[in-house]
């Protein structure tokens, strides 16, 4: 998958061109009859989206996601509340615009010529390619030429339908496919890994995130080159909403907010390791249930799943782990660090986890307050790995090379330079294995994404099984619900205590239509 980046140049060019076209609509505040005035009079910005790990999701009842966060900030920018409507597929999103039920579509939608004929695009903010996926171990097609409608299914409203039609007309006359009117791309990817479907097509970012939980999903081939992603609004003579979006994105670009949000949601990297991910998820099943109580007990200010990811990166959850350099235990502490923390046995899992958390908290306390709250943990983890003094050097080097020392996106790019003599020779604390610190933090982020998604998949499976049980035995009395007669209850009880988070929604769940007020 190609590297993702916010298309700042495209935003700038688009802003310049549209500013001229939209000049009669600027300033857009204060006009009596326009879309912005209607939104402000209503007191809410109506945004339709789809439920995916990237666009919109909930953890512990709190919404998050790249498109959600941008939409929330845009609503704040306009001085109104955000009303989010979650749809099942892309086709339903555009129905909302057509029926006047949404002001904006914020759902990772690709900019293409067919869509802009009928809808107004906004600035682009990252890019994706469309890819054909299959299940590992099944036949991998090397071309689209021989695929049939029995093999290939795509989601309704998917942008790739236009590309498939063009390929059929120009290159692959035998190519055929079908459109599932009810399922979105995430559901179709689930069908592929469950063996219900041979192939489907999804965007590269969605696939990358899906693979963190389902490593058996594999990419067969690219269907398109990179395509810009944008928001859409109604296309008519009123350009006030478009003008407001341009102003908003330009402001976000200039003050660095856009880059920070990109790093938050897209900064986990796009390199997927099938073996490593599969090994990690097997450890989640086999080892994590025994360690979870300790992670929950000592996590304190950080998410216990992040703490678990840190411990896995350190030792693969092996309390007896020892490195050639002498660091030992679950959190791989040095002898001196362990002594300073009062740890008497580094191979005792509880002592190691407790000490590791305290050491990490010490690193967190040293991170300057100028660093945004949601990025402080990454600075602290890099310091945990290579020492805080070298983190100071990394921030200083970032400032010297015209980057932002308070931005993790900028600082992490300079970390590998700490091992290069032209750079470390001029730094206060000298040489450091900055490339290792970079990989260390990136790996932890990937493990955290996999863990959160996988645990929520377990919750979904348990919930669906419980619902099926209720349907199968609607009139069973409590006295009949013995574990011998209904062994699933034993599994459900164990799952609830060993695996499940208490999040009411699922990172990779199948969602229908719902509305959220923010």
Curated annotation (Swiss-Prot):
Start and end residues of each stretch annotated as Non-LT domain: 22-269
Any GO BP: cell wall organization
Signal peptide start and end residues: 1-21
Reactions accelerated catalytically: Exolytic cleavage of the (1->4)-beta-glycosidic linkage between N-acetylmuramic acid (MurNAc) and N-acetylglucosamine (GlcNAc) residues in peptidoglycan, from either the reducing or the non-reducing ends of the peptidoglycan chains, with concomitant formation of a 1,6-anhydrobond in the MurNAc residue
CC per GO annotation: cell outer membrane
Membrane topology, record value: Peripheral membrane protein
Class in the EC hierarchy, top level: lyase
Keyword DNA-binding in record: no
EC number in record: 4.2.2.n1
Active site: 314
Membrane-crossing residue ranges in chain numbering: none
NCBIfam families per UniProt: PRK10859.1
Family to which the UniProt record says this protein belongs: In the N-terminal section; belongs to the bacterial solute-binding protein 3 family. In the C-terminal section; belongs to the transglycosylase Slt family.
Domain writeup: The N-terminal domain does not have lytic activity and probably modulates enzymatic activity. The C-terminal domain is the catalytic active domain.
Biological role: Murein-degrading enzyme that degrades murein glycan strands and insoluble, high-molecular weight murein sacculi, with the concomitant formation of a 1,6-anhydromuramoyl product. Lytic transglycosylases (LTs) play an integral role in the metabolism of the peptidoglycan (PG) sacculus. Their lytic action creates space within the PG sacculus to allow for its expansion as well as for the insertion of various structures such as secretion systems and flagella.
Name used for this protein in its record: Membrane-bound lytic murein transglycosylase F
């Amino acid at each position: 998958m190609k590297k993702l980046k916010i298309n700042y140049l495209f935003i700038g060019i688009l802003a310049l061109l549209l500013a001229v076209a939209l000049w009669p609509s600027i300033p857009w505040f204060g006009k009596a009859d326009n879309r912005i005035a209607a939104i402000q009079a209503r007191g809410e910005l109506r945004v339709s989206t789809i439920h995916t790990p990237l666009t919109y999701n909930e953890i512990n009842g709190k919404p998050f996601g790249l498109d959600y966060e941008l939409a929330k900030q845009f609503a704040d920018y306009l001085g109104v509340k955000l009303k989010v409507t979650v749809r099942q597929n892309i086709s339903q999103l555009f129905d909302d615009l057509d029926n006047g039920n949404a002001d904006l579509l914020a759902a990772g939608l690709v900019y293409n010529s067919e869509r802009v004929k009928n809808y107004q695009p906004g600035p682009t903010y990252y890019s994706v390619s469309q890819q054909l996926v299959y299940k590992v171990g099944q036949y991998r097609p090397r071309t689209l030429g021989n695929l049939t409608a029995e093999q290939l299914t795509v989601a309704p409203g998917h942008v790739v339908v236009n590309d498939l039609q063009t390929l059929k007309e120009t290159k692959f006359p035998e190519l055929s496919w079908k459109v599932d009117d009810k399922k979105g791309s995430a559901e179709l990817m689930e069908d592929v890994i469950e063996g219900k479907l041979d192939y489907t097509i999804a965007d590269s970012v969605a696939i990358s995130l899906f693979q963190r939980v389902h490593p058996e999903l594999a990419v067969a081939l690219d269907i398109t080159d990179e395509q810009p992603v944008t928001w859409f609004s109604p296309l008519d003579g009123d350009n006030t909403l478009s003008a407001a979006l341009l102003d908003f994105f330009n402001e976000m670009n200039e003050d660095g907010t856009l880059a920070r949000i990109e790093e938050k949601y897209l900064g986990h990297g796009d390199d997927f390791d099938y073996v490593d991910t599969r090994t990690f998820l097997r450890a989640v099943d086999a080892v994590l249930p025994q360690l979870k109580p300790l992670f929950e007990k000592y996590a304190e200010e950080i998410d216990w799943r992040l703490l678990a990811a840190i411990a896995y990166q350190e030792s693969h959850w092996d309390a007896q782990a020892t490195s050639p350099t002498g660091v030992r235990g679950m959190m791989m502490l040095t002898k001196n660090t362990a002594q300073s923390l009062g740890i008497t046995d580094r191979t005792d899992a509880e002592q190691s986890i407790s000490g590791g958390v305290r050491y990490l908290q010490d690193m967190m306390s040293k991170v300057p307050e100028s660093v945004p709250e949601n990025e402080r943990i990454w600075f602290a983890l890099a310091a945990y790995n290579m020492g805080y003094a070298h983190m100071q050097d990394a921030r200083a080097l970032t400032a010297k090379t015209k980057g932002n020392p308070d931005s993790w996106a900028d600082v992490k790019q300079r970390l590998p330079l700490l091992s290069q003599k032209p750079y470390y020779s001029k730094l206060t604390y000298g040489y450091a294995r900055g490339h290792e610190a970079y990989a260390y933090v990136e790996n932890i982020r990937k493990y955290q994404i996999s863990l959160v998604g996988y645990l929520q998949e377990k919750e979904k499976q348990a919930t669906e099984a419980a619902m099926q049980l209720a349907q199968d035995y609607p009139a069973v009395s409590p006295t009949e619900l013995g574990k011998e007669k209904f062994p699933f209850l034993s599994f459900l009880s164990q799952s609830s205590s060993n695996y499940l988070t208490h999040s009411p929604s699922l990172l990779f769940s199948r969602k229908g239509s719902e509305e959220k007020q923010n």
